[in-house]
Amino acid sequence: AAGVCNIETGVPATPDTLFQIGSITKLYTAALAMQLVETGKLDLDAPVRDTLPGFAVADAAVSRRLTLRHLLNHTSGIDGDFFKDAGRGEDRVEKYVRLLKDVHQVHPLGHMFSYCNAGFVVAGRMIEVADGTTWDRAIRKRLAKPLGTPAFSTLPEQAMRYQMAIGHVGQPGALSVTPIAYLAQSNAPAGSMPMACARDIITFARMMMSGGVAPNGTRVLPAGSVHAMHQRNVTCPARMNIDAAGLGTFLWDWDGDGRYEVFGHDGSTIGQASWLRYHPQSETAMALLTNGGNGKGLADDLIREVFTGAAGITPVEPPQPVAGLAVDRARVLGRYGKASGTIDVIEKQGMLVAVHKPAADFAVLQASHAIALQPAGDGLFVGTMPGFTRPVTYHFLEANGAGRARYLHTGVRAYRRMA
């Protein structure tokens, strides 16, 4: 452990400090769902409405046909960055799911991978109904307790019994404590609230690498469920952040043999970020929890060092610009959008530039910014965010009748063309 829990108090971080783990929570929600699939209380391929009869999104056909599998592998097409606060009562997840009735599709059901936070809250509600309890109680009873990780917390009043880290925002050298300590509790199954120490996350990874058996010898998941979570369901078009998705799990093929051998997830909340990678073949796992600064750069370096040294495999380098590559600018120019904001691809001083503008509800998470794009392949571009060195990929997909891209895929999300 290094650094401090809070720059205003100067309290040092320790191996026992709890950090917000963000979307690493999705691994836990998927594991809960798979436990209930194993007992027959949930079905991966049955309509969500079999469990939640009144479930609805804006698209009536999707409301009827959506399955748990679509939710866990991010192929629902639901515009998933929907962070409305449904309160703090024990019915908060249920209330949140009701709010989805007006949420539209980014793409048709099952059409492609596009990261969907809302889908995991729906899965959390299915867990509640199937298990007859709240998601918070289910995760403590079914995962935290058998794993032997009692400090794993899903509510602030649980976490305050331990040492906690607070998030920090701003640039390195000018960081300040985040004005918002937590995201909405109603989004907890997607990762808004849970807190854990790095050891807790590694314990979960060890369970997954051991076919569902925790380090303390307790069987947490059937081996078949772990295997299912590690199987490719869908590939990610912009292969930089991840290569493919399983059931709640991200997959990587670092050695290029066509098989996925590294698993895990990333997470972020306001001012905190987390990374988990594990390689069952070598029994190597790495967790990094941060509460400010350029955590992404540290994570990239640490992942490379740990897995090159301990597992003998090295992460694939991101795509690089290709000099002289012909670009069909008419294909990519235009506005792309989803609930979280818009990306305008414009021409400026002879260059293509992606101008990111967050929606009003997302301004606290990310400021407007522009990224110069350089061609790296057919429909593939790379650019570097301000303050970072590792490039981001922009993948322009499919074509409409005018030969213009229908979708822009970046940050593991699809944005549909708006203009």
Model-derived regions, located:
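Short, surface-exposed loop or secondary-structure junction motifs
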Residues: 2-7, 59-270, 274-275
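A short acidic/small-residue loop/turn micro-motif
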Residues: 4-7, 293-295, 413
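Short active-site loop at a secondary-structure junction
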Residues: 8-71, 106-118, 189-192, 283
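Hydrophobic "lid"/C-terminal helical patch
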Residues: 33, 204-208, 306
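Short acidic-glycine loop/turn motifs at beta-strand connectors
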Residues: 171-172, 253-256, 280-282, 348-351
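Peripheral terminal and inter-domain segments
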Residues: 240, 260, 281, 297-419
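Solvent-exposed loop/linker segments at secondary-structure transitions
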Residues: 249, 284-285, 309
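Short, well-ordered beta-strand elements
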Residues: 274-292, 409
